[in-house]
Structures are given as C-alpha cells and as structure tokens.
C-alpha cells in the first residue's frame, strides 16, 4: 500500500525494498490486489531487481536492518512496516545502515515520538525516528482536534468498527492472548481492544486522559469507521459542529480531514487519500453538549 501510494507522488522515489519474499512474489503481489485492484503500471523482475514503470528497485532479504547498506542506494527515509522493529533501539539499525530518517508505520513500543497529520505535525523538530501512529489514531485525531479547538471536549468514548486484518483467523483457531481474536473473521463481529483513543492524548496532550475506546472487528476487507461520542464544554448545535468541521476540511486540514454529506457507505472510501472523512449525515446529537460523530 505504501508503494502504491508513493507511485502517485512526484516527490517520492522508491529505491529499495527489504522483505523476506523473493522478487518474483513481490511483483505478483504488487500487480494483483484483491482489495485495491490491479496495479496501474508495468511490473517485472530483472536480475533480481524489481522493475516498476521502467525503474529498477533494489531488492534484499535481510533479517537484520543493520546489514541493509541503505547508503549504497541513497535512502533518505525508511518506511519501517514489518511491525517488528518498533522501538528506537531496533529501528535505529536503519540509521546505522545509512538511512537518514525512519518512519514507523504503526505505534511504537517505547517513547518514540508520534506525529499525526492534522494533529501535531507542526511540532516535528527533525527527529530521525518517528511513529506515524495507527490508522485509527490518524482517523480520530484530526476530528478530535477540530472539536476540541472549537468547542472543548470534556470527555469522550470512541468505538472503531474495524475491517479485518491479516492477523485474524479465516476460521476458528488458537489465539492464546486474545481468545475472541481467534474466532473466524468472516463469521463474527469481534469485540477487541484498541489503544487508538488513548494515543490521541500523545499527539494532542490537551486531550490526555479524556478519551478511551474499543473496537469491533467486522467481516469487511477494507475501510473502518470511527464513532466518537463526546461531551462538549461549549454548547453547540449539530449544524454548528458540521460547519466547523467543513471549514477545517477546506482550510488548515485540507487533504487530511475530508467532509461529505452524501449517502456513502464504507466501500466508497476504498483508496481514499484523506486520513479521516467526516460523515455529516451519520452523526447525531442528544443535546447541545452531547454528540456522536462519525
């Protein structure tokens, strides 16, 4: 997914990929995607390299990032997407290998600084290893910031209705740490934990301790929903809330926070470039201080 997204940007050039898969299988997985469709471009393998749209990309299969010799191919930024090297100590092996920066594609397991577009991106001060948080935090944080900046959040609960992930089981199987998580993904709505709401407190310190949440894993292949229910400090009608979110989506958060009043469903957001899209028709208000936002 990172690779496909990068192909749509002129300011990103993929020069190397490290994976334990061989190049032929990488090419196959890039060409064909059950969720996002066929790759729009040419993909082939030559002399052990992946060649995409005529550009040669170095392929390696190193288990230890320290051996990757990123400097030999002029790597500026490594997208650390294995889910294994999630601490400063382990991710720093990429720096040792010659990379200048490392972005963890999920939450870190230590105090590695976390940055989210639409939340605290402007506080980035050049750190060489950062986390981009989780997909749920990226969806929640921009919306929470707009609401808190305009109306103040006293407290809130978040529920994410989350598409299935690769760690789930196609049929019931062993899952010793999470018994429910071992049940068949295609057959069940599975309650699960998530640290996404609490993580918002790391990127928006003013909300630290004010939000928590949970997840339901559901049998859909892609696109998840965040349901944010909050109590407001400043009373506001639902129309006023919509107006504030729409203004943000057209202003400072354009390209990060989207806004729609269409009668949309989840598949309409397959391939969406915004990290969060507010569904104006889906939310409801109990009164001017208690509201559910989707």
From Swiss-Prot:
Keywords: Acetylation, Cytoplasm, Glycolysis, NAD, Nucleotide-binding, Oxidoreductase. SUPFAM superfamilies: Glyceraldehyde-3-phosphate dehydrogenase-like, C-terminal domain, NAD(P)-binding Rossmann-fold domains. It is an enzyme of class 1 (oxidoreductase). One of its GO terms (molecular function) is NAD binding. InterPro entries: GlycerAld/Erythrose_P_DH (IPR020831), GlycerAld_3-P_DH_AS (IPR020830), GlycerAld_3-P_DH_cat (IPR020829), GlycerAld_3-P_DH_NAD(P)-bd (IPR020828), Glyceraldehyde-3-P_DH_1 (IPR006424), NAD(P)-bd_dom_sf (IPR036291). SMART domains: Gp_dh_N. It is found in: Cytoplasm. The active site is at residue 135. GO terms for biological process: glucose metabolic process; glycolytic process. GO terms for cellular component: cytoplasm. NAD(+) binds at residues 19, 63, 105. It catalyses: D-glyceraldehyde 3-phosphate + phosphate + NAD(+) = (2R)-3-phospho-glyceroyl phosphate + NADH + H(+). The record marks 162 as: Activates thiol group during catalysis. Disulfide bonds: none annotated. D-glyceraldehyde 3-phosphate binds at residues 134-136, 165, 194-195, 217. Its EC number is 1.2.1.12. CDD domains: GAPDH_I_C (cd18126), GAPDH_I_N (cd05214). NCBIfam families: GAPDH-I, PRK15425.1. Homotetramer. Belongs to the glyceraldehyde-3-phosphate dehydrogenase family. Catalyzes the oxidative phosphorylation of glyceraldehyde 3-phosphate (G3P) to 1,3-bisphosphoglycerate (BPG) using the cofactor NAD. The first reaction step involves the formation of a hemiacetal intermediate between G3P and a cysteine residue, and this hemiacetal intermediate is then oxidized to a thioester, with concomitant reduction of NAD to NADH. The reduced NADH is then exchanged with the second NAD, and the thioester is attacked by a nucleophilic inorganic phosphate to produce BPG. This is Glyceraldehyde-3-phosphate dehydrogenase. It comes from Pseudescherichia vulneris. The lineage of its organism: Bacteria, Pseudomonadati, Pseudomonadota, Gammaproteobacteria, Enterobacterales.
């Amino acid at each position: 997914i990172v690779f496909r997204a990068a192909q749509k940007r002129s300011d990103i050039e993929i020069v190397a990929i490290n994976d334990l898969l061989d190049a032929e299988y990488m090419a196959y997985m890039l060409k064909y995607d059950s969720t996002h469709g066929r790759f729009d471009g040419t993909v082939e393998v030559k002399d052990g390299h992946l060649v995409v749209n005529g550009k040669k990309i170095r392929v390696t299969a190193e288990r230890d990032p320290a051996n990757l010799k990123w400097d030999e191919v002029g790597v500026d930024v490594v997208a650390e997407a294995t889910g294994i090297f999630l601490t400063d100590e382990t991710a720093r092996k990429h720096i040792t290998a010659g990379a200048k920066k490392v972005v963890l594609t999920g939450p870190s397991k230590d105090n590695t600084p976390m940055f989210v577009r639409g939340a605290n991106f402007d506080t980035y001060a050049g750190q060489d290893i950062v986390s981009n948080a989780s997909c749920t935090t990226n969806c929640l944080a921009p919306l929470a910031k707009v609401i808190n900046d305009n109306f103040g959040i006293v407290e809130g609960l978040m529920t994410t209705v989350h598409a299935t992930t690769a760690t789930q089981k196609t049929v019931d199987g062993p899952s010793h740490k999470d018994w429910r998580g071992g049940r068949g993904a295609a057959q069940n709505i599975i309650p699960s934990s998530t640290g996404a709401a609490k993580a918002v407190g790391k990127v928006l310190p003013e909300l630290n301790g004010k939000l928590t949440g949970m997840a339901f894993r559901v049998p859909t292949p892609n696109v998840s929903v965040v349901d944010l229910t909050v109590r407001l400090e400043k009373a506001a009608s639902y129309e006023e809330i919509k107006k504030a979110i729409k203004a943000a989506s057209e202003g400072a958060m354009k390209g990060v926070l989207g806004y729609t009043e269409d009668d949309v469903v989840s598949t309409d957001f397959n391939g969406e470039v915004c990290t969060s899209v507010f569904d104006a028709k889906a939310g409801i208000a109990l009164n001017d201080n208690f509201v559910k936002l989707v």
